[in-house]
Amino acid sequence: MGVFWSRGYHGTALPDLLRATKLSRGSLYAAFGDKHALFLRALDRYIADALARMDVELGPRHAPVDGLRTFLAGYVDRTSGSSGRRGCLLVATAMELAGHDGDVEGRIGGFFKAMEAKLAGALSRAKAAGELAAGVEPASAARILVCFVEGLRVVGKTGPTRTTSQATADALLDRFIR
């Protein structure tokens, strides 16, 4: 996954994959098929890891607003410093391949829908607890948060300070809660 993350799909050559996996050409093809199949497996793992993290952050074991704050703080952490400069495999892949590769487009679209659903669930729990501001609809707020965090991943490549990113995340969430 790291090679694709660092170089992108088109920038990754077979020798890069052989070095990273420590497999021979024949073993790599036997294990994964081809470069595209290996890339899709790497992308699937990245997505699964992100969704599992969201399940922990936004799950019912946390108060909804606390979970939302934890979720946003996690994104701020991942978009700050060297992590921010590295960027997001999903965003980079969307920019590089989503318009040309149906398999990739479907996976990324599915991820964004799943993220939106998890956020809408937490926001619905907050609404039921009387913690959402008047007029805030969970589904709309969830879409806004998805756009915000993915935009934060892009802006993170330019090196904003963690303090600035966290203040922006807090200001946005504060618009949604009481």
Residue ranges and their predicted role:
Residues 67-68, 82-103:
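Amphipathic alpha-helical segments used for helix-helix packing
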Residues 45, 56, 103-114, 118-121:
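Short, solvent-exposed amphipathic helices
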Residues 3-37, 41:
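Helix-turn-helix
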Residues 70-78, 113-129, 148, 158-178:
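C-terminal peripheral helix-coil segments that are non-catalytic and often amphipathic
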Residues 44-50:
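Short, basic, alpha-helical segments at the C-terminal edge of helix-turn-helix-like DNA-binding modules
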Residues 41, 55-86, 138-145:
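Hydrophobic alpha-helical connector segments
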Residues 86, 91, 136-155, 168-175:
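Hydrophobic alpha-helical segments that form the core
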Residues 65-66, 106-111, 128-144, 163-164:
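All-alpha amphipathic helical-bundle segments outside canonical DNA-binding/catalytic cores
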